[in-house]
Amino acid sequence: MRKIAAMLDTLSASQNSFYLIKEFNKLQSDNQYSPVCFYNNLSATPVKTHFACMNISYYSHFDGVTITTSIDTANTAIKTNNNSKKFLYLWDMEWLRNPMDFNYVNSVLSNDDIAIISRSNSHSDLIKNYCNKEVAGVVQDWNMEQLEKIVWT
């Protein structure tokens, strides 16, 4: 069984949450996969989930593929000592919208313990320019076919 987890700040109404839930609900119907979501802040979801959703405090017991969705959740995953293959899916460049410490963001992005997945080719170029690290791949809107090629190869 392939275990896959998403780590988010919140599952509240957003494009990111909508596509994540849509794709994880599809995975749940396949016996090959065991999707789970870890969140920092509990909130109402935009769509009903058909998979487990837990507080981030349970993450230390997870052993599978982890896909984080923000600089802060990526930092949490990096600092957690568990048997998980870790990825950061950069849906947007949050440091461009909100002031963030360059050293903090760069230390997370350039960490060898986490691979970066971008949402588009233009995001890939921006990430490489920002932290001098190649992305592991490009995934549009949580597309599981694209994601599988990156995380399980």
Give residue spans per PLM region.
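C-terminal functional extensions of proteins
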Residues: 127, 141-142
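Hydrophobic anchor at the start of a short beta-strand
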Residues: 31-36, 84-86, 133-137
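Histidine-centered beta-alpha loop that forms part of the nucleotide-sugar donor binding/catalytic region
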Residues: 9, 90-94, 140-141
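A short acidic, amphipathic alpha-helical/loop segment
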Residues: 19, 23, 76-81, 101-105, ...
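Short internal beta-strands
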Residues: 35-40, 89-90, 117-119
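Extended catalytic core of nucleotide-activated donor transferases of GT-like folds
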Residues: 43-110
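N-terminal pre-catalytic "stem/leader" segment of glycosyltransferase-like enzymes
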Residues: 1-62, 142-153
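A short, active-site helix/loop in glycosyltransferases that binds the activated sugar's phosphate group
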Residues: 76-77, 113-135
